[in-house]
C-alpha cells in the first residue's frame, strides 16, 4: 500500500536528508544513517513538544524512533528510497553525468547532486511517473537550496527523462 501523496513528499524529504548525510559521510553505512536519523528526528520532536522519554506510555516505549514518527508505509518508502539510492550511487551518477551540461557532477552542490540521485532512482528503479518525481525534485531543491537549484534540477531531469 502506497502512502498518500503528502506523506510521500515527507518521505522524499526525509530520504533526501539521509542521502545528503551519506554524501557528506561516505564511510557511514546506510543502516547507521537510518538509525541515527530516526533517533534524531524523534529527539527533536520530543524536545519541541516539551516531553521526555519518561512521558511515553509503555506501548510507545516499545517502538523504535522511526515507528513513532511515521506510519509503516511512509517509513518503508523512505527507507526504500535511501537504501536503493545509496546502493546504486555509481550507476545513478553515470546515468546523470551526460545530462549535467557544462557541469562536472563532482562540482555540483551536495543538495543538487543528492536530489538528482534520488529522483533518478525513483524514475528508473521504482518507475514512479517522471512528471511526479521531477515536480517533487524541483520542490526539494528549492526548499533545501534555492530557486536556481530548482531550475537546474528541472533541466537535468527533463533531459534525463528524454534521454
Residue ranges of model-derived segments:
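N-terminal interaction/assembly modules
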Residues: 1-163
Amino acid at each position: 500500500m502506497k502512502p498518500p501523496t503528502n506523506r510521500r513528499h515527507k518521505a522524499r524529504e526525509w530520504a533526501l536528508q539521509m542521502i545528503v548525510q551519506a554524501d557528506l559521510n561516505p564511510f557511514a553505512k546506510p543502516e547507521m544513517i537510518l538509525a541515527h536519523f530516526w533517533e534524531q528526528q524523534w529527539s527533536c520532536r520530543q524536545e519541541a513538544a516539551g516531553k521526555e522519554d519518561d512521558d511515553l506510555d509503555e506501548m510507545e516505549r516499545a517502538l523504535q524512533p522511526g515507528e513513532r514518527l511515521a506510519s509503516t508505509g511512509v517509513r518503508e518508502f523512505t527507507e526504500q528510497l535511501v537504501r536503493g539510492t545509496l546502493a546504486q550511487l555509481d550507476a545513478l551518477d553515470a546515468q546523470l553525468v551526460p545530462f549535467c551540461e557544462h557541469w562536472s557532477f563532482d562540482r555540483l552542490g551536495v543538495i543538487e547532486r543528492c536530489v538528482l540521485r534520488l529522483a533518478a532512482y525513483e524514475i528508473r528503479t521504482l518507475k514512479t511517473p517522471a512528471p511526479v518525481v521531477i515536480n517533487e525534485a524541483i520542490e526539494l531543491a528549492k526548499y533545501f537550496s534555492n530557486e536556481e537549484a530548482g531550475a537546474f534540477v528541472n533541466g537535468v531531469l527533463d533531459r534525463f527523462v528524454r534521454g
